[in-house]
Swiss-Prot record:
It holds the Pfam family EF-hand_6. The keyword Flavoprotein does not apply. GO terms for molecular function: actin binding; actin filament binding; calcium ion binding. The lineage of its organism: Eukaryota, Metazoa, Ecdysozoa, Arthropoda, Hexapoda. Residues 1-250 are annotated as: Actin-binding. This is Alpha-actinin, sarcomeric. Larval muscle isoform is expressed in the larval body wall, adult muscles of the head and abdomen and supercontractile muscles of the larva and adult. Adult muscle isoform accumulates within adult fibrillar and tubular muscles. F-actin cross-linking protein which is thought to anchor actin to a variety of intracellular structures. This is a bundling protein. It comes from the Eukaryota. It comes from Drosophila melanogaster. Ca(2+) binds at D791, N793, T795, R797, E802. Spectrin repeats lie at residues 251-395, 396-510, 511-631, 632-744.
Length: 924
């Protein structure tokens, strides 16, 4: 057939590729061989059972070629050449060749498959031949989007199972192992056969059995696969699964659409099958034709009646609607407001947008139905339809035209009324806008003009208020035009009969009345401001005059008060007399001051009178000064009171200075006697201390006589102390009548006593030294004369340089080298052991007597201790206690250091160190 030839031409190359693939791969896996054998056997039996036969062993039952030819006839629907009935090998080969030739005639190129292998029972070749047949007659006709049969079948499976979870078909081996893909294919086409929601990917055996059982029972697809083989085989045989899945494809494709496959059913078989139906039902055909003719006539008549009834109904409804609408369109009543007209316009637009379009469609449908009805009646030889009176097409058309004219007139009226009312509304809005602006401007103006705020102002603030009022007057004049415009707009609204003229007129009247009040209040405030300015200017002049006079007068008062209460300090009669004279001159000026005070007070009284008369708050505050009349009055009163107090103070001070003058004279008279006496006595004592006259005993006698005379003069000092105490109590610090002060006299008196005592002590020490050292009076006088010669200042002491010069003058040799300096420093350490920096006469005399007389030395004492110690270098405490008195023995034991030399015994004392320490030759 032509389609078969087309398929042969289109798919020939594909078959060759499949056969070559078969030859290359072979059946190396026993599991795959088992699956293919079982699947192919089931597939063959699914077709052979239609011929009333089956096979048990695929490699044995096809060896004679008879069932092979029968299988091809069943699946192709064609008749093959008559088979040979012999049982010889060549008969079998001939039958198999007939089958193979038939396959080749379908465009399938068989490669490496010969009749001999089939006859010999070669399982591999037999399965390959069956797979070729399956490809040609079961899979080849599967075509999806111009893909190969295998790819098309795979794509078909993917599309059908796409909506199902846990199903992802990518191939024909692993993707079908869990059985969900088989169940999904069945459920997609027959959801009534499987409850897919109860299936689980974890139970593949149950899924496979469910799919195979349902397919065999309800879809007439034989059980070609074994679930255990699919589960236990790592990679199931692809060809076995493809063969089985192709049965699903054909089963569901056939259920959806007959003849949709690529290979069409045999034409002769279909014609033969249909002719049987024709002969079966040919007797009932005439009766059916007659019944159909009657039904057709009745149906046309019923349709015509339906159209007539519908026309009547539509015509009545449309005319009734027009009748109800016309009064509304002809109405010209409105509330004379833009909102009311706009509401009517919106109602009209709603009518045109919502209500009329359905009626237009109704009218068009009415005319269409009428024309259709007349045409059908004419074609069916029926009389023309005549509507009831008043419902003809012309009646409806006339009513419709009247409606459209009414609509046009109504719309024109609405637009004209809208324009008129918009004009009125614009004027009303303009009136409102100007009135609002005017009222905003006037808000608070009356209160401002009626305000008495200027009564609280000072002059500068009042002038600012006046300037502000002048600006307001200018602004008021400028607003005159606005008020006139408001009145003109209100007049126009009245002329055009605005619907709310009452409120417009009332508002306009309020504005005009308020404008008149503002004018009157403005003039009244102007007058009040001028009067207030005049009064405040007068007060300001008085304040300024007060400030000019009060400031210098206040300064004079402050200065005067300070002078009157000034705590003056005077020490002489001349000073107090000068103060009294100045105070008398000041009192002479009080008359003029009293006049100035009265003038200042009168200025304040005048201000107070004006403020009280006009009740001006804060008018008494003077902006030019902080001084007040009360300040002036208080200070002037203080001055008047302080003047007599100052008189009394000056009088008291005068009496005090007179008494002080008397005390000065009294102290001076006594001090001028005591001071020279002390000086004379001091000179006499100093002369005696120089030791140049008489013996030491004579000097001592004379000093003691002076001592008695000085103590006898002490009452004069005590009397002078009493006078001095009175002077101090009177705070007298200067005395021009004497050069002596109590301090100088007291110091002189104390120095006199000290000098007498010191000289007595020195003379007594000199006598003791002379007697103990055995020096003569001449030597002593010589030492005194030398000491006094170098004591230039008569201080009774020599500096180191003076002492050195004195030694040289007495014949003492002191070198000028370093050794001489060391010797002199040793001598200074003897005569000035306390390092005071001076050498007194006693130390000088002691040094000179030691140098000039035979005195005891450290060596002499050491020799004495050596005798007591029996020539030992140390001495024991018992030896000291035995030879010396107890007190002197204990004195030596306590002060002698322990002996640290050789051959010492416990308790031994170092008498050598002790002896040298006694004479200052080493540290003890």
């Amino acid at each position: 057939m032509m389609m078969e030839n087309g398929l042969s031409m289109e798919y020939g190359d594909g078959y060759m590729e499949q056969e070559e693939e078969w030859e290359r791969e072979g059946l190396l896996d026993p599991a795959w061989e088992k699956q293919q054998k079982k699947t192919f056997t089931a597939w063959c039996n699914s077709h052979l059972r239609k011929a009333g036969t089956a096979i048990d062993n695929i490699e044995e039952d096809f060896r004679n070629g008879l069932k092979l030819m029968l299988l091809l006839e069943v699946i192709s629907g064609e008749t093959l050449p008559k088979p040979d009935r012999g049982k010889m090998r060549f008969h079998k080969i001939a039958n198999v060749n007939k089958a193979l030739d038939f396959i080749a005639s379908k465009g399938v190129h068989l490669v490496s498959i010969g009749a001999e292998e089939i006859v010999d029972g070669n399982l591999k070749m037999t399965l390959g031949m069956i797979w070729t047949i399956i490809l040609r007659f079961a899979i080849q006709d599967i075509s999806v989007e111009e893909m190969t049969a295998k790819e098309g079948l795979l794509l078909w499976c993917q599309r059908k199972t796409a909506p199902y979870k846990n199903v992802n078909v990518q191939n024909f081996h692993l993707s079908f192992k869990d059985g969900l893909a088989f169940c999904a294919l069945i459920h997609r086409h027959r959801p009534d056969l499987i409850d897919y929601a109860k299936l689980s990917k974890d139970n593949p055996l149950e899924n496979l059995n469910t799919a195979f059982d349902v397919a065999e029972k309800y879809l007439d697809i034989p059980r070609m696969l074994d679930p255990d083989d699919l589960i236990n085989t790592p990679k199931p045989d692809e060809r076995a699964i493809m063969t089985y899945v192709s049965c699903y494809y054909h089963a569901f494709q056939g259920a959806q659409q007959v003849g949709n496959n690529t290979a069409l059913p045999d034409e002769r078989a279909v014609m033969t099958y249909v002719s049987s139906y024709y002969h079966c039902f040919s007797g009932a055909q005439k009766a059916e034709t007659a019944a159909n003719r009657i039904c057709k006539v009745l149906k046309v008549n019923q349709e015509n009646e339906r159209l007539m009834e519908e026309y009547e109904r539509l015509a009545s409804d449309l005319l009734e609607w027009i009748r109800r609408t016309m009064p509304w369109l002809n109405s010209r009543q409105a509330d004379n407001s833009l909102a009311g007209v706009q509401k009517k316009l919106e109602e009209y637009r709603t009518y045109r947008r919502k209500h009329k379009p359905p009626r237009v469609e109704q009218k068009a449908k009415l005319e269409t139905n009428f024309n259709t009805l007349q045409t059908k009646l004419r074609l069916s030889n029926r009389p023309a339809y005549l509507p009831t009176e008043g419902k003809t097409v012309s009646d409806i058309s006339n009513s419709w035209k009247g409606l459209e004219l009414a609509e046009k007139a109504f719309e024109e009226w609405l637009l004209a009324e809208t324009m008129r009312l918009e004009r009125l509304e614009h004027l009303a809005q303009k009136f409102k806008h100007k009135a609002d602006a005017h009222e905003d401007w006037t808000r608070g103006k009356e209160e401002m003009l009626q305000s008495q705020d200027f009564r609280q102002c000072k002059l500068n603030e009042l002038k600012a208020l006046k300037k502000k009022h002048e600006a307001f007057e200018s602004d008021l004049a400028a607003h005159q035009d606005r008020v006139e415009q408001i009145a003109a707009i209100a007049q126009e609204l009245n002329t055009l009969e605005y619907h709310d003229c009452v409120s417009v007129n009332a508002r306009c009247q309020r504005i005009c009345d308020q404008w008149d009040r503002l004018g009157a209040l403005t003039q009244r405030r102007r007058t009040a401001l001028d009067e207030a300015e005049r009064i405040l200017e007068k007060i300001d002049i008085l304040h300024l005059e007060f400030a000019k006079r009060a400031a210098p007068f206040n300064n004079w008062l402050d200065g005067t008060r300070e002078d009157l209460v000034d705590m003056f300090i005077v020490h002489t009669m001349e000073e107090i007399q000068g103060l009294i004279q100045a105070h008398d001159q000041f009192k002479a000026t009080l008359g003029e001051a009293d006049k100035e005070f009265n003038l200042i007070v009168n200025l304040v009284r005048e201000v107070e009178s004006i403020v009280k008369q006009h009740q001006i708050p804060g008018g008494l505050e003077n902006p030019y000064t902080t001084l007040t009349a009360n300040d002036m009055t208080r200070k002037w009163s203080d001055v008047r009171q302080l003047v007599p107090q100052r008189d009394q103070t000056l009088a008291n001070e005068l009496r005090k200075q007179q008494n002080n003058e008397m005390l000065r004279r009294q102290f001076a008279e006594k001090a001028n006697i005591v001071g020279p006496w002390i000086e004379r006595q001091m000179d006499a004592v100093t002369a005696i201390g120089m030791g140049l006259q008489g013996s030491l005993e004579d000097q001592l006698h004379r000093l003691k006589e002076y001592e008695q005379a000085v103590y006898a003069y002490k009452p004069n000092i005590e009397e002078l102390e009493k006078i001095h105490q009175a002077v101090q109590e009177s705070m007298i610090f200067e005395n021009r009548y004497t050069n002596y002060t109590m301090e100088t006299l007291r110091v002189g008196w104390e120095q006199l006593l000290t000098s007498i005592n010191r000289n007595i002590n020195e003379v007594e020490n000199q006598i003791l030294t002379r007697d103990s050292k055995g020096i003569s009076q001449e030597q002593l006088n010589e030492f005194r004369s030398s000491f006094n010669h170098f004591d230039k200042n008569r201080t009774g002491r020599l500096s180191p340089e003076e002492f050195k010069s004195c030694l040289v003058s007495l014949g003492y040799s002191i070198g000028k080298d370093r050794q001489g300096d060391l010797d002199f420093q040793r001598i200074l350490a003897v005569v000035d052991p306390n390092n005071t920096g001076y050498v007194h006469f006693d130390a000088f005399l002691d040094f000179m007597t030691r140098e000039s007389t035979d005195t005891d030395t450290a060596e002499q004492v050491i020799d004495s201790f050596r005798i007591l110690a029996a020539d030992k270098p140390y001495i024991l405490p018992d030896e000291l206690r035995r030879e010396l008195p107890p007190d002197q023995a204990e004195y030596c034991i306590q002060r002698m250091p322990p002996y640290k030399g050789p051959n010492g015994v416990p308790g031994a004392l170092d008498y050598m160190s002790f002896s040298t320490a006694l004479y200052g030759e080493t540290d003890l």
